[in-house]
């Protein structure tokens, strides 16, 4: 657990702060920020030698002067419970039916997507490899090579716009358009 989450949970509880110069502050934690600057109220300040005591209504302690912070065990238990509930809610949120890729609730990347790379089911947009309607496939095979042609051709390779026999790898380039 992070010290900042521990301090934020400890707001409203009694803590003891020891500074690098040896002074200690016991008081009620009002608030803390990202730099571990702390506001305390109803504070008892103890000198380095523990021979002088001061009662202070409220004080501000800069985070980079802090050496040690002592918090009650109940705060540690509260932080552990909060982290567990956050973890379960985060996991439940991520367990929705989103696919890989875009995260928009649809199939995303891979074989099932109609557009983009992969196999694709739309004859206007064949992906790499084969697919239905011979889109981008090679010689009517479901797993052709190359990128395929634009509209429903059975020839593989990059090819031209519509049904041209000119193309790259894969397919049967001997037939005419």
Curated annotation (Swiss-Prot):
Keywords: mRNA processing, mRNA splicing, Nucleus, Ribonucleoprotein, RNA-binding, Spliceosome. Component of the precatalytic spliceosome (spliceosome B complex). Component of the U4/U6-U5 tri-snRNP complex, a building block of the precatalytic spliceosome (spliceosome B complex). LSM2, LSM3, LSM4, LSM5, LSM6, LSM7 and LSM8 form a heptameric, ring-shaped subcomplex (the LSM2-8 complex) that is part of the U4/U6-U5 tri-snRNP complex and the precatalytic spliceosome. Plays a role in pre-mRNA splicing as component of the U4/U6-U5 tri-snRNP complex that is involved in spliceosome assembly, and as component of the precatalytic spliceosome (spliceosome B complex). The heptameric LSM2-8 complex binds specifically to the 3'-terminal U-tract of U6 snRNA. The gene is lsm4. Belongs to the snRNP Sm proteins family. One of its GO terms (biological process) is spliceosomal snRNP assembly. The lineage of its organism: Eukaryota, Amoebozoa, Evosea, Eumycetozoa, Dictyostelia. Residues 87-177 are annotated as: Disordered. Residues 110-122, 146-163 have a biased composition (Basic and acidic residues). SUPFAM superfamilies: Sm-like ribonucleoproteins (SSF50182). The keyword Ribonucleoprotein applies. InterPro entries: Lsm4, LSm4/Sm_D1/D3, LSM_dom_sf, Sm, Sm_dom_euk/arc. Pfam families: LSM (PF01423). GO terms for molecular function: RNA binding; U6 snRNA binding. This is Probable U6 snRNA-associated Sm-like protein LSm4. It is found in: Nucleus. One of its GO terms (cellular component) is U6 snRNP. The keyword Nucleus applies. Residues 2-75 form the Sm domain. Residues 126-139 have a biased composition (Gly residues).
